[in-house]
Amino acid sequence: MAKSKFERVKPHINVGTIGHVDHGKTTLTAAITTILTRKFGGEAKSYAQIDSAPEERARGITINTSHVEYETDKRHYAHVDCPGHADYVKNMITGAAQMDGAILVVSAADGPMPQTREHILLARQVGVPYIIVFMNKADMVDDAELLELVEMEIRELLSKYDFPGDDTPIIIGSALKALEGDKGDIGEAAILKLAEVLDSYIPEPQRAIDGAFIMPVEDVFSISGRGTVVTGRVERGIVKVGDEIEIVGLRPTIKTTCTGVEMFRKLLDQGQAGDNVGILLRGTKREEVERGQVLAKPGSILPHTKFSAEIYVLSKEEGGRHTPFFAGYRPQFYFRTTDVTGSIELPAGVEMVMPGDNISVNVNLIAPIAMSDGLRFAIREGGRTVGAGVVAKVIE
């Protein structure tokens, strides 16, 4: 049989399972692929296949992640599942697996547990926009009142971290029963209900090309008779010849105009998200632009020096620090294409941060960087990665 071409006719959405250890995230992932494959085609994955997650690297950090995909009536989903808690923390902070929505798995028998809370907090900090709840192991609970109680607890916990607890869809089921072929309400029916909710509750994300133009500066050249060319990969949006552009970060913002876009030595009318381009700037001197700045649509992004962040500190085994760090620690923060020194403020009551920890901190940079909430960065010491982080909230 000839191999069928991957036809992307359906919109593509990225999701993942989160929740406490042993609440059934991987079993649910296996159940979703198994049941949706029967209905919409694709490839089913067993628990064992998903559980043996391969290693991948993101921002110098090794993470174990399983990727599966499945189809529903309306969409194509890419779904990530991690074997261990530390992998979730690293995955969410590095943005290795960007999620348009998360499926929070909570055991109906246990209710919310410490990692349930931590994953909800992480989802809030790193900007996962939507959470759907799958209350698993419902076959182990006979008491309807107990199910209601667990549901209330979950809703309260979501609201506490600024998710719409009262309106969050909660599906009650048993992933194991569904995998075993149970056609009842908590078996296959619950999985199909979950698929419907994924389709209806998570809106289609904005495509990168539809956003405001931004391009991190990688290199700057001066071409005699033509002016200054800035090269880089367009992160978001479209830039056209004649567009006004701001150069943001590291020094006061300046305005300029794009007078040419070239790619592979050919002149284009425009460059768009994903393209590696050279952008010719009118009247801008070579020394006015440097690596680490961004070219952006005027007013769409501002330079900042102070922000709160969620960070993960590499353990010694991962090639990170061997010793803890304390308040006032001054590493380099690597944003997009450059390092900027900054100091870390720890939360009240926290004396030190150990290798392998994740924590919320405030950061003060010595030079401004173009940023908005959700921007990822690496933490480095002399060019060596010792941590990863994400901007939770810009302060000033």
UniProtKB/Swiss-Prot annotation:
Ranges where the record places region G1: 19-26
Q: What Pfam families does the record tag this protein with?
A: GTP_EFTU, GTP_EFTU_D2, GTP_EFTU_D3
Q: Name one GO molecular function term.
A: GTPase activity
CDD domains annotated for this entry? EF_Tu, EFTU_II, EFTU_III
Q: Name one GO cellular component term.
A: cytosol
Q: What does this protein do?
A: GTP hydrolase that promotes the GTP-dependent binding of aminoacyl-tRNA to the A-site of ribosomes during protein biosynthesis.
NCBIfam families given in the database record: EF-Tu, PRK00049.1, PRK12735.1, PRK12736.1, small_GTP
Protein name, UniProt field: Elongation factor Tu 2
Name of the coding gene:
tuf2
